[in-house]
Regions:
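Conserved strand-helix element at the start of the C-terminal RecA-like helicase core
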Residues: 116, 133-149, 299-325, 377-388, ...
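Flexible beta-alpha connector loops of hexameric P-loop NTPases
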Residues: 162-170, 212-223, 283-289, 376-380, ...
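Accessory, non-ATPase domains that flank or precede helicase/AAA+ motor cores in DNA-metabolism machines
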Residues: 1-244, 251, 256-272, 303-304, ...
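Conserved nucleotide-binding/hydrolysis modules and their immediate coupling elements
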Residues: 1-15, 353-357, 370-376, 380-405, ...
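Conserved helicase motor
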Residues: 139-151, 155, 161-175, 190-197, ...
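Amphipathic alpha-helical transducer elements in NTP-driven molecular machines
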Residues: 13, 17-21, 32, 36, ...
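Cys/His-rich Zn2+-binding cysteine-cluster or related metal-binding knuckle/ribbon modules and their
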Residues: 33, 41, 170, 182-185, ...
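Accessory helical-bundle/CTD segments and flexible terminal tails appended to RecA-like ATPase motors
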Residues: 50-53, 278, 283, 331-332, ...
């Protein structure tokens, strides 16, 4: 014993607990991804370096954490006594939940009904009533976190909060992760990767805007943070609360089947009404103009009344493509099967450029047509920059603000833009879907939606569901303060389409019933489970040949073939990206278990002929995706 030496712990981090290991193991199995590849990305890069371990404890001190927020907000704190009756009823329902039992609750509230106030009061009760309790709030996007951070800090000023998302520096994320992992942070607020954070005293989970497609990761581990959150809650025997004004069809289906408990908030606060929806048939609109006469007049009237207007067009840039007026040349990307978008300015470049939004290739706008030499080059279509330019000409005295991925490149820039809107420093806001999510604007009197039809008739079977949700969400930004009812104008060539007809009455239940019937008739989710096998290579023939071999293997080894369908390999809708030709193989089954069994066997078969996920010949890179959003 005299020769024994004291053991020195090299890392200040606690071991990963059993529950988080079980979550990672489930994700690895279900999404058919390596366990290390699943778990390691969730651990901050800073903690992976042994050089940082010695100074780790000092770095992780809570009182020095810039990623731990407790700065009070200027927003009004809503105490339980200040909730309206529907909010108080919803809070009472949540308060009665058994916090040692798994259950999935769904807070179904119209936009502006005060869902956030309800769940903040609920979380405050959980933390107050359960010693050492921690709570996790998941948001779909980084730009939604600053406003909610401030609200939480005002609502629970004495509780430590850790914020986790990819916009933080390595050290900031390491500090916040440490605070969550050691139980020091009571409120953990983050985007999708936060679901894999060890939280030793997790008491409940909230998934806000649960319908949002951003919860599904598209590259690498193709997981759904919402679905993993539900599994985690079940495994840890705690309740989970999903929130949305526009639930996903899968969630709605689960409510109908009695798997989720629904709590309704059917009234907006301040006795506000949802905007009146007016459909403008584009055949009647001014031809050859960027903004129709009807929109011009309505925007001018709204400006004169001193109310803000929001113009929603889900295309950033000046124009989706550049064309030649003399020949058939279009600004196609040489490395992708898409067009290079024209930007009047992009980042630090103040002169016009062409940029591919798929691979990032950027070029100067040519002075003349590369094909025929003619100088008559014309922008096709309209993006946010073009709309902004036109609005400045129509109403020169108005303060116009553009909000898209170009102007809100960082979290700081994004927060500055939204602060200007909240403080009334913008009269007309032009932007993309960034504007439609979770922001509480108080003076929007008019919403204009341009090019909504672009999503309506696409090859994406989820497009009607996505468009309806997007339009309801963007409508919900208007008329929140009460007073005169706001308006929503939508330009469309197809005003009789069910999406627009159900939207006019905000008939969510009717639209969901309509969609479920369509999906059931077409044998689509949620009535079947799907998976995609992706393949990419330099030549499309190699990608298709690889997938054809995968299909042969599945058909040879699948019992009860009638219950499992394997479609022929096809090129992807966007077949070429960054010089790689991409194809896919769709597999679907009524039984999720049967599909999982076949995918596991297929993964084993493909790995035998591959190094990692690249074939041994080096020609094809492949992956398997569960529950794809796009097929």
């Amino acid at each position: 014993l005299a020769k024994l030496k004291a053991v020195k712990a090299l890392s200040p981090l606690p071991c990963l607990d059993k529950k988080i290991r079980e979550l990672a193991e489930f994700a690895s199995r279900y999404y058919i991804y390596g366990l290390g590849e699943t778990l390691l990305p969730a651990i901050p890069k800073w903690w992976k370096s042994p050089a940082n371990w010695e100074k780790g404890l000092g770095v992780a001190r809570i009182d020095k954490l810039s990623a731990i927020k407790n700065t009070p907000s200027h927003d009004k704190v809503i105490d339980p006594e200040q909730l309206n009756q529907p909010q108080a009823d919803a809070l009472r329902h949540l308060s009665n939940a058994d916090h040692k039992k798994f259950q999935t609750l769904f807070l179904n509230g119209v936009t502006g009904s005060g869902k956030t106030a309800v769940y903040l009061n609920y979380l405050q009760q959980v933390i107050s009533n359960h010693r050492d309790a921690q709570v996790l709030i998941l948001l779909p996007e980084i730009n939604l976190t600053p406003h909610l951070e401030r609200r939480i800090a005002s609502h629970m000023p004495n509780q430590e909060m850790a914020v986790l998302h990819s916009g933080l520096s390595d050290k900031q994320r390491a500090r916040a992760w440490y605070a969550a992992t050691t139980g020091k942070a009571k409120v953990i607020l983050g985007t999708r990767l936060s679901i894999l954070t060890p939280i030793p005293n997790l008491a409940t989970i909230v998934v806000d805007e649960e319908h949002d497609s951003s919860f599904k990761q598209q590259e690498g581990l193709g997981y759904s943070a919402r679905d993993l959150a539900i599994w985690r809650a079940k495994n840890e025997s705690i309740p989970i609360l999903l929130c949305s004004a526009t639930p996903s069809l899968e969630t709605w289906h689960a409510i109908e089947r009695g798997r989720y408990q629904e709590i309704k908030l059917s009234e907006r606060i301040h006795q506000a009404q949802m905007p009146i929806v007016e459909l403008i048939q584009t055949q009647q609109a001014d031809r050859g103009t960027v903004i129709s006469g009807i929109l011009k007049r309505t925007l001018q009237n709204n400006f004169q009344e001193g109310r803000q207007a929001l113009i929603f067009v889900n295309r950033r840039g000046f124009a989706p493509a550049l064309s030649c007026g003399s020949c058939d040349w279009l600004s196609e990307c040489p490395d992708c099967s898409g067009f290079m978008v024209m930007h009047k300015q992009l980042g630090s470049r103040r002169s016009p450029v062409l940029c591919c939004h798929h691979c990032g290739l950027t070029k100067s706008v040519p002075r003349s047509c590369p094909k025929c030499g003619d100088s008559d080059l014309l922008p096709l279509g309209r993006g946010t920059q073009k709309i902004e330019e036109q609005i400045r000409e129509i109403i020169p005295q108005a303060k116009v603000l553009r909000v898209d991925a170009d102007t809100a490149r960082t979290g700081k820039l994004s927060e500055e833009l939204f602060t200007k809107i909240h403080q009334g420093e913008a009269d007309i806001i032009v932007g993309t879907q960034m504007l439609s999510k979770g922001h509480d604007y108080q003076n929007i009197g008019l919403v204009c939606v341009l090019d909504a039809d672009a999503r309506l008739y696409s090859n994406d079977y989820r497009a009607p569901e996505t468009l309806f949700a997007q339009l309801v969400q963007v409508a919900g930004r208007a008329g929140r303060s009460g007073g005169e009812q706001a308006k929503m104008l939508i330009e469309t060539r197809y005003p009789s389409d069910p999406v627009y007809q159900y939207l006019r009455n905000y008939d969510l239940a009717g639209f969901m019933k309509h969609l479920l019937k369509e999906r059931q008739d077409s044998r689509l989710p949620p009535y079947v489970s799907q998976a995609l096998v992706h393949a990419q290579s330099t030549h499309m023939a190699d990608s298709l040949s690889f997938l054809a071999g995968a299909k042969v293997h599945i058909e040879k080894n699948s019992p009860n073939q009638g219950r499992l369908v394997c479609f022929d390999p096809v090129p992807k809708a966007l077949a070429k990206v960054a010089g790689k030709e991409r194809a896919q193989l769709l597999i679907e089954a009524e039984s999720r278990t049967q599909l999982q069994t076949q995918l596991n066997a297929l993964d084993e078969f493909l790995r035998k002929q591959s190094t990692g996920r690249i074939t041994k010949q080096g020609k094809v890179r492949w992956s398997i995706e569960r529950d794809p959003l796009l097929i």
